[in-house]
C-alpha cells in the first residue's frame, strides 16, 4: 500500500497565488503561452529583420550616388589622375617640339646623309660591314684545295713572289681542330692580288690549288666556295620558277617504279 500524501506537503492554493498566476502567464509555465501571443511575436521579429535589411540596402545604394561618390577620397584621387592624363595628352598634341630639338634632329639626318654619300663610303654598299675589313678583303685571295698537311709558313713562302704578305689564315674545324682544306692570304697591296691569281690551278704539295680574289661576306647574302654571290630570295625564286616550268613525264602503261630497277622515264625533279 502506498502511503497517503498528507496535506502538509501539498497545501491547497491560496487566492493570492491564483490571482498572480492568472495575471502573469510566465508563472504558469511553458504550457501557459497562448497561440495568439506566439503568432503575434513571430511576425514582429521578421518585420524587424526586413526593416534592417532594407536600411542596409538603402545605405549601400546611397553610397553609389554621385554626391556621395564625390565625397569619397579614393574617387577624388582617381578622377584627378584621369584629368591629369587627359591634360598631358592634349598638350602633347597641341604643343610642338622646341626649335632646338628640331634643329638638332635635322643636323643629325644631314650628317648621316653626308656620311653615306661621301667618296670613302660609296664603295661600301653595306654600312654594317667595317671599312677596315672591306679593305683587307680587297687585298686578300682565297686558296682552295690546300693539302691538310700544309702550314702557314709554306703558303707564305709559296706566295711570297707575288708581294709582301701581311697574314696567312688556314681555316680549321672548331670541333675537331683539323684544317678544312682552304686558306686566305692577305697582301700589303691590291696589285699583289692580281699576281697571286695567276697561280690558279698550280701545284702546291702535290695538289692543284684554286686561287681567286676574296669576296666580302655581307649580311643577307650567301656565297658558295667561289661560286659567286647570290641572294636567298633570288635562289628560291629560280627554284620555284624552274619547278613550275618543268612538265611531268608520263610513263608508259604497265611500267612503275620498282625497288630493284629504276624506270628510264623516272625523273626525281
Swiss-Prot record:
SMART domains per UniProt: RRM (SM00360)
Compartments in which it is found: Cytoplasm
Residues in the signal sequence: none
Primary location recorded for the protein, binned into one broad class: cytoplasm
Annotated RRM domain residues: 139-216
CC annotations in GO: cytoplasm; nucleus
Gene Ontology MF annotations: poly(A) binding; RNA binding
A Pfam family recorded for this sequence: RRM_1
BP terms from Gene Ontology: maternal-to-zygotic transition of gene expression; negative regulation of protein ubiquitination; negative regulation of SCF-dependent proteasomal ubiquitin-dependent catabolic process; nuclear-transcribed mRNA catabolic process, deadenylation-dependent decay
Domain of life the protein comes from: Eukaryota
Region (Disordered): 26-54, 240-269
PROSITE patterns: RRM (PS50102)
Keyword terms of this UniProt record: Cytoplasm, RNA-binding
Coiled coil (UniProt feature): none
Role noted for this protein: Binds the poly(A) tail of mRNA.
Protein name: Embryonic polyadenylate-binding protein 2
Source taxonomy: Eukaryota, Metazoa, Chordata, Craniata, Vertebrata
The gene coding this protein: Pabpn1l
